[in-house]
């Protein structure tokens, strides 16, 4: 009986460790136009993951995000935007409407993914990993509002997050991007 409990404990521990060992690169998401986008294609790049919305007081951050992307995209850095309608209905549009909004209003050229949920029962698997310590191995970081920013290193590891109201040009983000 003792051997059985030891086996079960070892199995639970190994499954827990396997979940923590999952990397950003293990996920595949969909682009705003519906194509599969394996995040493994970003190996070797620092990635800033941001949940975005077009009818939020923080929506002007799109301009800063684009400026940040333009400034660092040639230095193994990329931004990925995930439209989400989780906060007061501030992203009500379809994927097509969101893509048009980003292009017309902010000339966004960084990748925008298909609309997802970033909290609640229908939370996207990637956002479970981004927000749960038991999965990312680092920290619980529930999404507080639109434009929360998650930093992923060149090896697909969770580095940290920046609160929604903080500028994409915050010292935390810039020093992380520029760190060699």
What are these regions (language model features)?
Residues 45-46, 55, 59-83, 103-106:
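Conserved helix-turn-beta segment immediately C-terminal to the redox Cys motif
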Residues 125-128, 132-180:
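Thiol-/selenol-based redox modules, centered on thioredoxin-like
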């Amino acid at each position: 009986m003792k051997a059985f409990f030891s086996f079960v404990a070892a199995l639970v521990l190994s499954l827990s460790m396997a979940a923590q060992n999952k990397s950003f690169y293990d996920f595949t998401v969909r682009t705003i136009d519906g194509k599969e986008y394996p995040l493994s294609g970003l190996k070797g790049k620092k990635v800033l993951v941001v949940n975005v919305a077009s009818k939020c007081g923080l929506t002007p951050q799109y301009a800063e995000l684009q400026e940040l992307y333009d400034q660092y995209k040639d230095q193994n850095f990329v931004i990925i935007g995930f439209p989400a309608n989780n906060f007061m209905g501030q992203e009500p549009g379809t994927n097509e409407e969101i893509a048009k909004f980003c292009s017309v209003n902010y000339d966004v050229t960084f990748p925008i993914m298909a609309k997802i949920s970033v909290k609640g029962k229908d939370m996207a698997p990637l956002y479970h990993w981004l927000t749960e310590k038991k999965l990312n191995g680092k920290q619980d970081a529930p999404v507080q509002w639109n434009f929360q920013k998650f930093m992923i290193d060149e090896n697909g590891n969770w580095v940290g997050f920046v609160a929604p109201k903080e500028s994409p040009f915050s010292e935390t983000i810039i020093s992380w991007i520029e760190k060699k």
